Amino acid sequence: RASPPSESRAPLRAPQRSATRQHQARQGPRRMCNGGRGPPYWTAGVTSAPARQTPLFSGRPSGGLSDPNEVAAVILGGGTGTQLFPLTSTRATPAVPIGGCYRLIDIPMSNCFNSGINKIFVMTQFNSASLNRHIHRTYLGGGINFTDGSVEVLAATQMPGEAAGWFRGTADAWRKIIWVLEDYYKNKSIEHILILSGDQLYRMDYMELVQKHVDDNADITLSCAPVGESRASEYGLVKFDSSGRVVQFSEQPKGDDLEAMKVDTSFLNFAIDDPAKYPYIASMGVYVFKRDVLLNLLKSRYAELHDFGSEILPRALHDHNVQAYVFTDYWEDIGTIRSFFDANRALCEQPPKFEFYDPKTPFFTSPRYLPPTKSDKCRIKEAIILHGCFLRECKIEHTAFSRLNSGSELKNAMMMGADSYETEDEMSRLMSEGKVPIGVGENTKISNCIIDMNARIGRDVVISNKEGVQEADRPEEGYYIRSGIVVIQKNATIKDGTVV
């Protein structure tokens, strides 16, 4: 059992995973995760019913398994991204960099490919230029071989005569482009719709989720995870009975409503340390719908509702078979600057709570063809070194970084890199003109900071927020403070000698 990743998320045992699924080549019963020690999900009573264990697979022949060719995935990537501002001031949330060389959109995309699902739609709306560019370069420009699959970007659109404007929620986004999907489904024999978020960090075999959905003959299946009290109010919380059927759903409850959603999570003691610390089961925002059920909910039964979590799902419980799939691996919702910062910092730890590298289920991203990193007389502890870095006589700890000059020190920081290089001659010319080159200058000390792309930080700068300011807006000076973390804006310049 692993150590707790945070007080809000349960420490979970990482399962062993099979290679990318090719449905036609499957032989025998599906291998369970946790190395065969237990089921990858549990169906158990978390209301008044006694807990019981239900294995995911019962050793049926491969002919009874779900076909990934009958599944289409839709990634919701069109939110305003206000909670990740200023990182989302010029980009959509799924385009935000993570882990040194990836984008958040790479997480659900890679999970789909590794699950054998190759019919993927990405819905976009706000600040979508960089997201569209990344998707094209990575998944449409010859980088990934889809065989008979496809990736299609569905931009927000308005039909003639519509009173409303842009997408007003997750369900409304679906409703406005459903005519495109209906035309697609007619020709592709799609039976199940997988709905995903573009702002989470996790590794999941989606076909295990789909298989449970089929085995239970569910109309809707929610993927859920145990969470602690500190962040429970940020999520939609669920209760389900001994058969796994969801009996209550509450979106971001507070006060007494939050207390009422507590459950007995002792049935998860096979996977987490001290389940009592994680008394809530949260919806991950990952859903599987029967195709016809989804179309009926959006076009007829709940045609006036805009959001899945807060409006449609609580109502659908009463007249549909809504099942829960409890996910017991690492999962982090990247919904705020604090959670984004903590998730990136955790990637630097040894061993990390989440590992991007897995030869059987790799994460894909756009190739950048950068040269190897060069370093000289540096002291580095628990850090992620980006491609093509230049490091000179610097000290780095718990940091993801790029270009640093002599005497600089970074601790608990994240640098997102730059779009282009500046040569030594260009840097010398800029400094002779009193300007600041890209990267971190000499003798600069930085801690608890996120440095967005193409930032120019001068010499003898100190960024530490010693006064402990929690929130501040200083766009004219090139930075914001969110949850006590200093965020240097994209393309910002911090002049020599500045103290933040």
Curated annotation (Swiss-Prot):
Q: Does the keyword Plastid apply?
A: yes
Query: Pathway, per Swiss-Prot/TrEMBL?
Result: Glycan biosynthesis; starch biosynthesis
Q: Which Gene3D superfamilies match?
A: Hexapeptide repeat proteins, Spore Coat Polysaccharide Biosynthesis Protein SpsA, Chain A
How does its record describe regulation of its activity?
Insensitive to 3'phosphoglycerate and orthophosphate.
Q: Where is the transit peptide?
A: 1-33
MF terms in GO: ATP binding; glucose-1-phosphate adenylyltransferase activity
The record's region (Disordered) falls at 1-47
Its GO CC terms? amyloplast; chloroplast
Q: Where in the cell is it found?
A: Plastid, Chloroplast; Plastid, Amyloplast
The main place the protein resides is: plastid
Could you tell me what reaction this enzyme catalyses? alpha-D-glucose 1-phosphate + ATP + H(+) = ADP-alpha-D-glucose + diphosphate
Superkingdom of this protein's organism: Eukaryota
Q: Name one GO biological process term.
A: glycogen biosynthetic process
The record's similarity note reads: Belongs to the bacterial/plant glucose-1-phosphate adenylyltransferase family.
| PANTHER family reported in the protein's UniProt record | GLUCOSE-1-PHOSPHATE ADENYLYLTRANSFERASE LARGE SUBUNIT 1, CHLOROPLASTIC-RELATED, GLUCOSE-1-PHOSPHATE ADENYLYLTRANSFERASE-RELATED
What quaternary arrangement does the UniProt entry report?
Heterotetramer.
Any idea what job this protein has? This protein plays a role in synthesis of starch. It catalyzes the synthesis of the activated glycosyl donor, ADP-glucose from Glc-1-P and ATP.
Q: What is this protein called?
A: Glucose-1-phosphate adenylyltransferase large subunit, chloroplastic/amyloplastic
Q: Which organism is it from?
A: Triticum aestivum (Wheat)
State which gene encodes it.
AGA.7
